[in-house]
Amino acid sequence: MQLLKDKFGRVHDYIRISVTDRCNLRCVYCMPEEGLTFLPHEKVLSKDEIVSFMELMVKFGIKKVRITGGEPLLRTDIVEIVRGLGAIPEIEDISITTNAMYLAKKAEALKEAGLTRVNISLDSLHADRFQAITRGGRLQKVLDGIQKAEEVGLFPIKLNVVLIKGQNDDEITDFLQFTKDKDINIRFIEYMPIGHAGTSWKEKYLPLDTIFKACDDASFEYEPVDSIRGNGPSENFRIKGAKGTFGVIHPVSAHFCDSCNRLRLTADGYIKACLYWDEEMNIRPFIHEPVKLMQLVQKAIDNKPENHEMALKLQDEVQSNKPTWRRMSQIGG
């Protein structure tokens, strides 16, 4: 099997597929509140195009898929997309990232279709604050979604918490306490300068050393834990006696580019080898031309930089490439 390897020796076996750029929320770090233009439906990859693409990609070593958006559960055919991917025997793991507003309704059908596990965005445990950060989200719907995911067996359940200075950094201890009572993995993620968030991100950025300080201040004893299924770049820990775990993902303060194994496919059919850089290849016209398609995929991988240089932006230093101005919802979070 010919593997998808870049010039730094990194083998790519994981892809994140965005199935929509639309979302029912407007999280402050992801999308502006208004003035948005979304892709016309005919510009979005169809279920058949996604499945055909993956039937080819598995022949080159891709074996893990994460479905993203926008909010993927807005797709009326999301269960059929999962079912189509689940029918490809080489795919070992199918996961989804969701805001969970519709998860309680769809978790059982998604599990039956072949979904393996779920990541849920949850940036506050206080209903009013959660509504403010998401510009309209209802915390109880997320909690109901978590419960339903537990009931149907979508394990491990991971909660993604973007740490935002002055907005939710006073809840770190509450999130850590949450892991004591539930068998879930809470992942604290540094605020990143992507798209819309890139203009004001320094005001909201906190390094993830803040998490460990909060543990120490609360007298929580913690220790590293072995790899959690699908843990990716997360460094994981367990508070003594806790049922669950917590992790830290620090793309800015300590990048993990040397072990990056992922590609991204946008909802409109562009391959991106690096989340941060602007370069992307339009593969949609060649979905049914495997030779040309794989040439473009390999070209994207060949052009992948050694690292994303987000830390240089933190220091106002010059970067070697042009950062993306796509929103996270347009790339696929």
From Swiss-Prot:
<feature type="binding site">
    <location>
        <position position="16"/>
    </location>
    <ligand>
        <name>GTP</name>
    </ligand>
</feature>
<feature type="binding site">
    <location>
        <position position="29"/>
    </location>
    <ligand>
        <name>S-adenosyl-L-methionine</name>
    </ligand>
</feature>
<feature type="domain" description="Radical SAM core">
    <location>
        <begin position="7"/>
        <end position="221"/>
    </location>
</feature>
<feature type="binding site">
    <location>
        <position position="257"/>
    </location>
    <ligand>
        <name>[4Fe-4S] cluster 2</name>
    </ligand>
</feature>
<dbReference type="GO" id="GO:0006777">
    <property type="term" value="P:Mo-molybdopterin cofactor biosynthetic process"/>
</dbReference>
<feature type="binding site">
    <location>
        <position position="158"/>
    </location>
    <ligand>
        <name>GTP</name>
    </ligand>
</feature>
<dbReference type="GO" id="GO:0005525">
    <property type="term" value="F:GTP binding"/>
</dbReference>
<comment type="function">
    <text>Catalyzes the cyclization of GTP to (8S)-3',8-cyclo-7,8-dihydroguanosine 5'-triphosphate.</text>
</comment>
<feature type="binding site">
    <location>
        <position position="97"/>
    </location>
    <ligand>
        <name>GTP</name>
    </ligand>
</feature>
<dbReference type="InterPro" id="IPR013483">
    <property type="entry name" value="MoaA"/>
</dbReference>
<dbReference type="GO" id="GO:0061799">
    <property type="term" value="F:cyclic pyranopterin monophosphate synthase activity"/>
</dbReference>
<keyword id="KW-0411">Iron-sulfur</keyword>
<feature type="binding site">
    <location>
        <position position="27"/>
    </location>
    <ligand>
        <name>[4Fe-4S] cluster 1</name>
    </ligand>
</feature>
<comment type="pathway">
    <text>Cofactor biosynthesis; molybdopterin biosynthesis.</text>
</comment>
<dbReference type="InterPro" id="IPR007197">
    <property type="entry name" value="rSAM"/>
</dbReference>
<keyword id="KW-0342">GTP-binding</keyword>
<feature type="binding site">
    <location>
        <position position="260"/>
    </location>
    <ligand>
        <name>[4Fe-4S] cluster 2</name>
    </ligand>
</feature>
<dbReference type="InterPro" id="IPR050105">
    <property type="entry name" value="MoCo_biosynth_MoaA/MoaC"/>
</dbReference>
<feature type="binding site">
    <location>
        <position position="121"/>
    </location>
    <ligand>
        <name>S-adenosyl-L-methionine</name>
    </ligand>
</feature>
<dbReference type="InterPro" id="IPR006638">
    <property type="entry name" value="Elp3/MiaA/NifB-like_rSAM"/>
</dbReference>
<dbReference type="GO" id="GO:0051539">
    <property type="term" value="F:4 iron, 4 sulfur cluster binding"/>
</dbReference>
<dbReference type="Pfam" id="PF13353">
    <property type="entry name" value="Fer4_12"/>
</dbReference>
<keyword id="KW-0501">Molybdenum cofactor biosynthesis</keyword>
<dbReference type="Pfam" id="PF06463">
    <property type="entry name" value="Mob_synth_C"/>
</dbReference>
<keyword id="KW-0479">Metal-binding</keyword>
<dbReference type="InterPro" id="IPR010505">
    <property type="entry name" value="MoaA_twitch"/>
</dbReference>
<comment type="subunit">
    <text>Monomer and homodimer.</text>
</comment>
<dbReference type="GO" id="GO:0061798">
    <property type="term" value="F:GTP 3',8'-cyclase activity"/>
</dbReference>
<feature type="binding site">
    <location>
        <position position="23"/>
    </location>
    <ligand>
        <name>[4Fe-4S] cluster 1</name>
    </ligand>
</feature>
<protein>
    <recommendedName>
        <fullName>GTP 3',8-cyclase</fullName>
        <ecNumber>4.1.99.22</ecNumber>
    </recommendedName>
</protein>
<feature type="binding site">
    <location>
        <position position="66"/>
    </location>
    <ligand>
        <name>GTP</name>
    </ligand>
</feature>
<keyword id="KW-0456">Lyase</keyword>
<feature type="binding site">
    <location>
        <position position="30"/>
    </location>
    <ligand>
        <name>[4Fe-4S] cluster 1</name>
    </ligand>
</feature>
<dbReference type="Pfam" id="PF04055">
    <property type="entry name" value="Radical_SAM"/>
</dbReference>
<dbReference type="InterPro" id="IPR000385">
    <property type="entry name" value="MoaA_NifB_PqqE_Fe-S-bd_CS"/>
</dbReference>
<keyword id="KW-0408">Iron</keyword>
<comment type="similarity">
    <text>Belongs to the radical SAM superfamily. MoaA family.</text>
</comment>
<feature type="binding site">
    <location>
        <position position="274"/>
    </location>
    <ligand>
        <name>[4Fe-4S] cluster 2</name>
    </ligand>
</feature>
<feature type="binding site">
    <location>
        <position position="70"/>
    </location>
    <ligand>
        <name>S-adenosyl-L-methionine</name>
    </ligand>
</feature>
<keyword id="KW-0949">S-adenosyl-L-methionine</keyword>
<feature type="binding site">
    <location>
        <begin position="262"/>
        <end position="264"/>
    </location>
    <ligand>
        <name>GTP</name>
    </ligand>
</feature>
<keyword id="KW-0547">Nucleotide-binding</keyword>
